[in-house]
Every structure is written in structure tokens, then in C-alpha cells.
Design a protein with these regions (language model features):
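Class I S-adenosyl-L-methionine
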Residues: 1-19, 24-102
Length: 102
């Protein structure tokens, strides 16, 4: 039997774009979670993470880029969503809390 306590997934909004407008609760959650997951563009940009970095020191955190396909093909979408879910689940199963930034 697996005795590892599962991590918790936290959905965290970084607000409208200005780090100074992030809520205190969002900042506190990001500070406390060892893993930060955020959508990443095909060009490699992680806007939600960039905004969070303006309010929180993320050094020492595990950064988990999530790739969500921009496609109308439902199979492509399902595959990209499953890959993102699997990546997050691996950390949760290892007992690490994850903040999903958006």
C-alpha cells in the first residue's frame, strides 16, 4: 500500500496582468507550493508565470510548463490535455502541492 500523502492542486489566478493586483491569497499559495504549473505558448512564453514572478520569488520552485494545443481537432486536444494532466498528477502523486497558474 502506498503511504505517500497526495499533494493538493490549487487553481491560482494571477489577475488581470499587473503583479500588484494579485490577491494576498494567490501570493501566499504560490509561495507555499513547491510546484508551479502554467500554460506555455508554442514560442515558450509562460505569461501567468511571468506575472507571478513580479510578486513572488519563484527561485527554488519546480516550474512545470503545460502545453495546450490550439486545435479544433478533438483528438489533438484530448492528447494535449491528457499530457498536461499526467504531468501535474505525477507531482501530486509524489506528495507535492501544485499551484496551477492562470
Amino acid at each position: 500500500m502506498d503511504n505517500v500523502k497526495k499533494g493538493t492542486l490549487h487553481g491560482v489566478s494571477v489577475g488581470p496582468g499587473d503583479p500588484e493586483l494579485m490577491t494576498l491569497k494567490a501570493v501566499r499559495c504560490i509561495e507555499q507550493c513547491p510546484v508551479l504549473a502554467a500554460p506555455q505558448t508554442a514560442a515558450g512564453r509562460m505569461l501567468a508565470l511571468d506575472i507571478a514572478k513580479g510578486a513572488v520569488d519563484v527561485s527554488g520552485k519546480i516550474i512545470l510548463p503545460l502545453h495546450f494545443a490550439m486545435s479544433r481537432d478533438s483528438e489533438v486536444l484530448k492528447a494535449s490535455h491528457a499530457a498536461a494532466a499526467d504531468a501535474v498528477r505525477a507531482h501530486l502523486d509524489a506528495g507535492r502541492d501544485v499551484a496551477l497558474l492562470n
